[in-house]
């Protein structure tokens, strides 16, 4: 693909990258042939396994949506595949798909789309998801159901998809905004992290003929996604990371595999004095050789035209008539904690299952006051699908609504989240399993029959209108007015609340003050959204530092109980409301919820 050099590469990679670009074929003598004369814009080429066809994203006119097209390798017989489902980008061929309900397998393709206009977990814009369809454009199916961008799909030799995915928002500050490599089956099942080590942002993966996973990485996400080149081994992706290029080598984009174990990649200098040209890179030595460069254009997304082995076919258990999926865990105590003694058996009492609701709602039509979300508070609403006991051996087995973004939180005796995960999901009829809670992905578990799978799955599939939410305006503020104001209405109070704090402005000011930053970068003075156990407000409510040994806030120092002995003590339900509110993101306003539905002790799960 070539793109005129005077164009500025835009940050909106999905809609603006490739605007006005053209597809060209470069011959060995460096002569070129344009293949996309009938298109205003064409980009994202993908070569078929037999090298006879090419998929690409194109726009006939500037006002068109991006759609997926296929043509013969010589540019003839152009046909549109997607139509009327929004902007579609980044196509790639899949291998054969087999199902138990179809007498014949079929070929599919993967693409990226914002067809459903689902907002991300910041509420900032539509989320890009992976989709699949047959080569004739029928049987369009969504594959990813998290609330963050998914992009750059690449088909691996075993038939799974490798792609880049952004970690969920601010409930885990260490991962917030990172883009890592993930793997998934071509039917959307078994979503799992593939490679994380290296720099913060990893994009544009490909795999060489010798089993080297190549990707672009950077610590600062540039407007075009460019960076250095890193790699990991296909056979040990979690433990074999190494950098191939260094910063002084320039900026790189869109690596693709060659038949001789090398890669094609676009490169330019970091000072913006030139345009991208296409180079051959030897991953073992880092040696670069210029292949093609048109000085007036950015030359990117180069793909060599040669036949290659077709990936393994895949089967699928997904049955769309089944509205639910299952999720089981063998042992929540298998984890990545540095010291296993930090979480002895018996620490985890229950499991809370949260649903991510991508659309932003507000009770009674009220609006969230401008500026109240401080950049670390997630915008997406969370609803409680259920809360259940964990088996004595650390296992659980639940049935959840299919194709629904969920977050798991393991809870201690006080109902505080100890560990949590990013957005995951189960497809229709999928029996999804996990070994532990952030376990080592290279290790296999002990071969034991865990207790939870000897019983039917616990159903956590209440109708949406019966799923409980917790928010500040409706649930927390009434407790503050009832139990806290008697001490905090004094002029010398550290956190002062006026006696007449009843207007929306008063309530908004209290909420904003609870989210105020601490004295050090990243610190919070009162609450950490998503982590009740490390929030000083919770320490005072429980009269002790509730942090755990793996938290940097862990301390045995005495904490003053609030309300004090002479005050009106909070009930267990009132304490639990504060805990749930913070663990679920400390949102200002929630989804409308009649009488908050059920009590804190019954969250939709059935317990044996």
Mark where each language-model region is.
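Aromatic- and Gly/Pro-enriched helix-to-coil junctions and flexible linker segments
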Residues: 1, 18, 341, 346-348, ...
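Alpha-helix boundary/interfacial micro-motifs
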Residues: 61, 101-102, 163, 176, ...
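Sequence signature of WD/YWTD-type beta-propeller architectures
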Residues: 1-393, 399, 418-433, 444
């Amino acid at each position: 693909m070539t793109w005129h050099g005077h164009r500025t590469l835009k940050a909106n990679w999905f809609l603006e990258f490739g605007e006005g670009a053209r597809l060209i074929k470069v011959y060995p003598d460096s002569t070129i042939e344009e293949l996309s004369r009938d298109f205003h814009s064409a980009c994202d080429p993908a070569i078929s396994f037999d090298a006879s066809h090419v998929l690409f994203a194109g726009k006939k006119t500037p006002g068109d949506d991006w759609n997926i097209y296929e043509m013969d390798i010589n540019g003839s017989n152009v046909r549109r595949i997607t139509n009327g489902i929004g902007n579609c980008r980044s196509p790639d061929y899949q291998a054969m798909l087999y199902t138990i309900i179809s007498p014949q397998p079929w070929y599919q393709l993967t693409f990226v789309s914002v067809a459903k206009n689902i907002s991300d977990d910041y509420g900032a814009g539509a989320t890009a998801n992976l989709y699949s369809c047959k080569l004739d454009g029928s049987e369009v199916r969504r594959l990813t159901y998290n609330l963050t961008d998914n992009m750059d799909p690449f088909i691996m030799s075993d038939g799974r998809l490798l792609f880049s995915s952004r970690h969920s928002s601010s409930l885990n500050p260490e991962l917030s905004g990172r883009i890592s490599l993930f793997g998934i089956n071509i039917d959307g099942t078994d979503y799992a992290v593939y490679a994380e080590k290296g720099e913060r942002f990893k994009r544009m993966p490909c795999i060489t003929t010798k089993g080297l996973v190549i990707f672009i990485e950077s610590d600062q996400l540039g407007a075009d996604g460019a960076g250095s080149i890193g790699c990991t081994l296909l056979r040990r992706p979690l433990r074999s990371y190494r950098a191939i290029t260094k910063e002084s080598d320039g900026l790189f984009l869109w690596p693709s595999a060659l038949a001789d174990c090398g890669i094609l990649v676009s490169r330019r200098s970091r000072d913006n004095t030139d345009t991208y040209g296409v180079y051959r890179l030897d991953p073992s030595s880092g040696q670069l050789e210029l292949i093609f460069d048109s000085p007036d254009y950015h030359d990117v997304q180069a793909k060599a035209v040669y036949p290659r082995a077709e990936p393994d076919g895949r089967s699928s258990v997904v049955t769309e008539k089944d509205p639910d999926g299952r999720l089981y865990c063998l042992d929540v105590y298998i984890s990545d904690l540095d010291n296993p003694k930090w979480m002895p058996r018996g620490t985890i009492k229950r499991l809370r299952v949260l649903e991510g609701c991508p659309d932003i709602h507000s009770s009674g039509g009220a609006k969230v006051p401008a500026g109240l979300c401080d950049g670390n508070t997630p915008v997406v609403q969370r609803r409680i699908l259920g809360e259940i006991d964990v088996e004595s051996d650390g296992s659980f087995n639940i049935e959840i609504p299919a194709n629904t973004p969920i977050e798991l939180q393991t809870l201690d005796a006080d109902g505080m989240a100890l560990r949590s995960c990013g957005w995951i999901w189960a497809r229709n009829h999928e029996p999804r399993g996990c070994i532990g809670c952030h376990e080592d992905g290279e290790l296999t578990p002990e071969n034991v029959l865990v207790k939870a799978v000897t019983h039917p799955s616990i159903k956590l599939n209440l109708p949406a209108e019966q799923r409980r939410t917790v928010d500040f305006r409706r649930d927390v503020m009434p407790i503050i007015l009832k139990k806290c104001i008697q001490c905090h209405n004094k002029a010398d109070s550290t956190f002062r609340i006026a006696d007449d704090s009843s207007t929306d402005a008063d309530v908004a000011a209290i909420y904003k003050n609870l989210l105020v930053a601490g004295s050090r970068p990243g610190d919070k003075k009162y609450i950490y959204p998503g982590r009740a156990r490390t929030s000083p407000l919770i320490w005072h409510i429980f009269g002790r530092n509730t942090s755990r040994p793996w938290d940097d806030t862990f301390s045995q120092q005495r904490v003053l109980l609030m309300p004090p002995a002479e005050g009106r003590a909070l009930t267990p339900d009132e304490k639990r409301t504060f805990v749930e509110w913070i663990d679920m993101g400390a949102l200002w306003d929630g989804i409308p919820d009649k009488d908050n539905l059920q009590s804190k002790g019954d969250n939709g799960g059935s317990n044996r």
